[in-house]
A protein has these predicted regions:
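Glycan-binding loop/region signatures in secreted carbohydrate-active enzymes
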Residues: 23-112, 141
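Extracellular/periplasmic catalytic domains that process cell-envelope and extracellular macromolecules
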Residues: 12-16, 90-92, 114-116
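Conserved, mostly hydrophobic/aromatic
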Residues: 21, 113, 121
């Protein structure tokens, strides 16, 4: 995943005992829909003119994201590339996509941090973590 690659790169110039990895307690919900003719016209001459879709996102805490997926009747599946659960559903003229930060994805990150014997882990944003997160962190970090 991305964290593993980032740590590998950082370790080329920073000793493991000086490196702290940051992990998120939030996830982003992405919404993508085709651009209108007006939006294409407004984007003319900019880099955005090359993209056929309008994209926006919003942040959700771990528990809120799980509730949202459930309320939409969507199913999650494991994305081995990102090491996250993923869901998508259609609505409002477009597609909603979410790669979840949850205890499963967090554990994958903590395994990489422990394997590389890093100095520690930093989490953000406090208050957005799901239940069971701190017990999981204590299993991997002293």
């Amino acid at each position: 995943g991305y964290l593993k690659n980032g740590i590998s790169e950082a370790l080329k110039s920073v000793p493991a005992d000086k490196l702290i990895a940051g992990v998120p307690f939030y996830t982003r919900l992405w919404f993508e829909r085709p651009k209108t003719d007006e939006e294409f016209a407004a984007d003319e001459g900019t880099e955005a003119e090359n993209y056929p879709n309008k994209v926006k996102s919003s942040a959700y805490g771990m528990d809120d994201a799980a509730e949202l997926i459930s309320s939409m009747g969507a199913q999650t599946e494991w994305d081995d590339k990102t090491k996250q659960n993923y869901a998508q559903w259609e609505g409002d003229g477009g597609v909603y996509k979410i790669w979840l930060e949850d205890t499963q994805s967090l554990e994958e990150k903590l395994k990489v941090i422990k394997e590389n014997q890093l100095a520690g882990v930093a989490e953000w944003s406090l208050g957005m973590e799901g239940s069971g997160v701190w017990d999981l962190i204590l299993q991997y970090v002293n």
